Amino acid sequence: MTTTPLIDPFQRAIDYLRVSVTDRCDFRCVYCMSENMTFLPKKELLTLEELDRMCSTFIRLGVKKLRITGGEPLVRRDIMTFFDRMSRHLDSGALRELTLTTNGSQLEKFADGLYAAGMRRINVSMDTLDEKKFAEITRWGRLPQVLRGIDAAQKAGLRIKINAVALKGFNEDELFPMVDWCAERDMDLTFIEVMPMGDIGNENRLGQYWALSDLRNTLRERFTLTELDERTGGPARYVRLEETGQKLGFITPLTHNFCESCNRVRLTCTGELFMCLGQEDNADLRKPLREYPDDDRALENAIRAAIALKPKGHDFDYSRQRLDGQMTRHMSHTGG
């Protein structure tokens, strides 16, 4: 049976779903959450079986790429069961890619299993190569553990992209070392501007903000940057460093509107569907999922109704030294 694909009001095909499987994390990164973060009661979270049904419904409606996020997805109990279940959609060809964003803390344990489940690429969030600064930025993290995880992932056959948040006064001096380190290990690298989402305690996001336009100018002191006309439907813009052949990505939600080709929606660990990372509009998909356990039609209708409300663009704004666009929810809940 042919199913009509998900098309939003601006004629963008929605074929990429990002799913947060937990809001919990074993780090407390200063730009992400407070050290005394209060997490959701477990009863509010979708079960692994419900996540399977939810994702399978999206795949039936045309989703081709599924990225699992958190929190830290690998701290969710029995998460490998979910990945193993999702692999059937890769085997059938219904799903083109199953992937993961992780802080790397659990990779040493799970890398082989992830590859066996059909993953071939993962993103690892890591902002510094300095062990002391790593402990400072993550509060609870340990760099050697993450580096062992990265080694294990590469040994298992997983291709890795490092995501580094650009933080003013913190990792500015590591720009070239990070580029060199990734080049030596044949890993892609993307720099990300800090996002204005959720209460993070005493930290000041505006003080952390390092415009990637400044970062690019610093890179030009050493490298020739060639713009790549590469579009993934996502926020990253890519350049090639001619001296090394490396590909670098830049995600600039605050200084560059990346919305025109957006092909994705985000499902939280509680079953809320956010049509845009930078807006608060959402749809409750947990309700039809649980009210009709043996019939997916209500869930399909709710998904289509939500996609019909997808906005053209986001509301992030750091202009005039304000936090006008700050979202109240946390990335750990929405999915990073």
Curated annotation (Swiss-Prot):
Protein name, UniProt field: GTP 3',8-cyclase
Function noted in UniProt: Catalyzes the cyclization of GTP to (8S)-3',8-cyclo-7,8-dihydroguanosine 5'-triphosphate.
Enzyme class: lyase
Binding site for GTP: 18, 67, 101, 161, 264-266
Cofactor: [4Fe-4S] cluster
UniProt lineage: Bacteria, Pseudomonadati, Pseudomonadota, Alphaproteobacteria, Rhodobacterales
Catalytic activity: GTP + AH2 + S-adenosyl-L-methionine = (8S)-3',8-cyclo-7,8-dihydroguanosine 5'-triphosphate + 5'-deoxyadenosine + L-methionine + A + H(+)
Primary gene name: moaA
UniProt xrefs under SUPFAM superfamilies: Radical SAM enzymes (SSF102114)
